[in-house]
């Protein structure tokens, strides 16, 4: 029922597939409300339940993840992202699933490199060393991807997809990337940092999962991004300004200043328990441009390339329609 998962369910249903969804006890229907699907209540720590409920399923999509840039205790995040991944994949293998698509992140792929002063986006051939990972979310996903790779080497039919920065509708939580859009719409972004992301429509990411199940090579990983989606944050905010009819921030904050604000913000969070306005993990991520080359997924899978501008327009429309934006 998360951002990518709920969009994936919609795309599967639109193609005539029968869908079974695992939801935690007490989890609201949220973006899946009203959809014709089979809902199973349980937890990814319950291996017997996973194997039983996946029996008879042709495909398994493991898109669930704990995605936070700040927590008092990161132990549950590692349990969900690493051991949860192992449980789901092994259960899917025992249940006889023909294809297992694991949702990783571009955070497990190398960073943009400067070659003779030009930025060269990273691709699937590059792997970031664990020592260079800037936060616990990335570390947990890095270890989870290692689990998926090792299980694929043992013969399980696993395809790994690495979404970049998805944007679009049904971002209920919202995700940290969706929060950028929401902060802009709610006038909470007076300045920006010099960073960059690869933006992609969440619908294309969802379709990319299905294409991976249909066409992906077992043991391979595919960046689900947009070939023309490598934008600086300044460019991103300029596009948002045009779409939303709001002024874009003009003040650029140097990296060191963002880092200081993050340390102060986290200090307050530790004392109060309130999520920091500027997480240290987010500030550290802003140090590098996170640009990627999705050419492999475009060539091998036929990954759709909806213009990123449309992704932002759809996100703005959804946030406004669902009352996330203060009047």
PLM segments and residue spans:
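N-terminal Rossmann NAD(P)H-binding glycine-rich loop of SDR-like oxidoreductase domains
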Residues: 1-17
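Mid/C-terminal beta-alpha module of Rossmann-like enzyme folds, strongest
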Residues: 208-277, 294, 299, 309-327
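Conserved Rossmann-fold NAD(P)-dependent oxidoreductase catalytic core, especially the SDR/UDP-sugar
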Residues: 80-137
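NAD(P)H-binding glycine-rich loop region in Rossmannoid oxidoreductase-like domains
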Residues: 27-33, 37-83, 91
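Catalytic helix-loop patch of NAD(P)-dependent Rossmann-fold dehydrogenases
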Residues: 115-161, 165, 189-190
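Short-chain dehydrogenase/reductase
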Residues: 78-82, 123-126, 133-145, 175-178, ...
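NAD(P)-dependent short-chain dehydrogenase/reductase
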Residues: 154-160, 164-198
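Substrate-positioning beta->alpha
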Residues: 87, 143, 176, 193-214, ...
